[in-house]
A protein has these predicted regions:
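PLP-dependent class I/II
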Residues: 1-158
Length: 158
């Protein structure tokens, strides 16, 4: 849309009772978004929407390319996300193996080894309750995505 990921701002339509519960939860779990994010969100809602379609199409193309290509790499897989800017790469088949001298117990081990030896940063999903998954962002160019996938193939082959 307006590329405001990470700003932690949004809105919801709910009945009064649910809205009250949501408000109570938010007031105890997080502070209000900064004033700049609030103003930007208003402008994104009332501003031109043609760029939203353009950006959505670009993200879909990168997502589809990443998913299709990753699912051809032996040892890893991913599902096609419906509303994110990243995929969750399943590395369950790599758990218990040694890659570049590193015994892979979970996503943390994989992410550390891949960063050190493949020079690609991924986010381990251990903290999200998914110890056999790492996140790959597709909020970048197709060229960068392909370079990352090329490095993954090389990393897994050596």
């Amino acid at each position: 849309s307006y590329a405001m990921t990470g700003w932690r701002i949004g809105y919801a339509a709910a009945n009064e009772q649910i809205a009250k519960v949501m408000s109570n939860y938010l007031s105890h779990s997080t502070a209000a978004p900064c004033s700049i994010a609030q103003k930007a969100a208003v402008e994104a809602l009332i501003g031109p929407q043609d760029t939203v379609d353009t950006m959505t199409s670009a993200f879909e193309a990168r997502r589809d390319h990443l998913v299709e290509r990753m699912n051809r790499i032996p040892g890893v897989s991913c599902l096609k996300p419906e509303g994110a800017f990243y995929i969750m790469m399943n590395l369950e088949q790599l758990v218990g193996k040694t890659l570049h001298g590193v015994f892979i117990r979970d996503a943390d081990d994989f992410a550390d080894a891949f960063l050190k030896h493949g020079l690609v940063a991924t986010v381990p999903c251990t903290g999200f309750g998914a110890p056999n998954f790492v996140r790959w962002s597709y909020a970048t160019s197709l060229q960068n995505i392909d370079e990352g996938l090329n490095r993954l193939e090389k990393f897994l082959a050596e």
